[in-house]
Amino acid sequence: MNLRMIITAVWLYERTGLGSTLAWLGLIELAVRIPSNLYGGVFADRLDRKKLIAFTQFFSFFLIGFMALLESSSSLEIWHVYLVSAILSATSVFGNPARSAFTARVVPRNVLSHAVAMNTITWQVGTIVTPFIFYLTSFAWRDTASDSLVLSFWINTLIAFFSVISPFFIRESGKALEITKTTSINKNLIEGFKYVISHPILPGLYILDIGVTVVSYYRELFPIFAKQLYSRGRDAVAILTAFNAIGAIFGSLLVMYTHKIKRKGVIVLYATLVYGFLLIIFGWSTSIWIGIFALIALGAADAVGMTMRQTVVQLTTPDNMRGRATAAHSLAAMSANGIGKWEVAIMSDYIGAGNTMILGGFVSILVVLIIWYALSGVRKYSYQED
């Protein structure tokens, strides 16, 4: 998925030169993510999670291959990219609750934060590798990188094929414990909604995620920052994406040393507060070296906050509700990503990408302070071993 997002973002931005092109892509993705995520959580608690993951990954393989064929014949159009991105956003989000809920089945509770961190590290290793795959296959290393992205599309198709078969190598059963198929799907959905709303911690975590991400989403928008902040092209996109992922790996490794800290909600708040200050640094500087430093630190802070949020969701939710609880978490995150992608891309056309990040940093700090004092459940949460 990382490689697809880089390829399509660069393809769209090079075709139009407008941040709004990526902004509308974010809204299209958001429109399909909401229902897909909600029902993905319900089905993750009813169906075999391994099969559900493989089913959703098949769409990635098929549709990325479809774009590769169109690009090979110079027939790929903007509406094709929008349509395929919408479908793949829906299927990817539909499978997210199954992936998240499955994690808690294969590891003991006392090392769950380690497992979530390793998932994040695996994801970020891919995020490091894929920019360099893009760098090579898009010929960004040439003085004038204007070649077709057809090779990038085909390599992405090959990688997607392996994602279809990989879930079946996991030996643990994919079925949820205490599964209740007798209840209707809509009743399952309502039951999950009521559980999340009444939870003492989860609403605060979700509001925090939404409040910060809506004003600061920068991933998938590196073509804009590369051009506006550093006057660079594909090479800078690959560099910025990779170093942000390196930072995320450092952050995920740091999480492994926090397993003895009981007040995990405080870790989330501090990590998000640091994230806000780093956004200001990233937006303020036009030096790519300072930008790289800021992105490494941003990746680390974001990874700590994200991993701990996911861990708290898993620790405070019974297995037969995890699919729906993680779906609610994904809904908050993915919805914020879509709106944030639109907001940041549009604002970058009007006030500049740097000013947009500075504004986002100040708003993020304000959101953390509001959650700290107004929704104290997050701050007061302390993990207790069974």
For each predicted feature, which ranges?
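Pair of pore-lining "gating" transmembrane helices in MFS-fold secondary transporters
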Residues: 1-11, 86, 197-217, 296
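Intracellular juxtamembrane helix-capping segments at the cytosolic ends
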Residues: 8, 94-107, 304-317
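Transmembrane alpha-helix termini and helix-breaking/packing motifs in multi-pass membrane transporters
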Residues: 9-15, 68-73, 129-155, 228-229, ...
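C-terminal transmembrane bundle of multi-pass solute transporters/carriers
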Residues: 23-28, 35-39, 46, 50-52, ...
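Short hydrophobic/alpha-helical segments at membrane-entry points of transmembrane helices
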Residues: 76-84, 204-205, 289-295
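Helix-loop junctions on the cytosolic side of multi-pass membrane transporters
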Residues: 101, 105, 147-149, 153-183, ...
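Juxtamembrane intracellular "pre-TM" segments in multi-pass secondary transporters
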Residues: 172-207
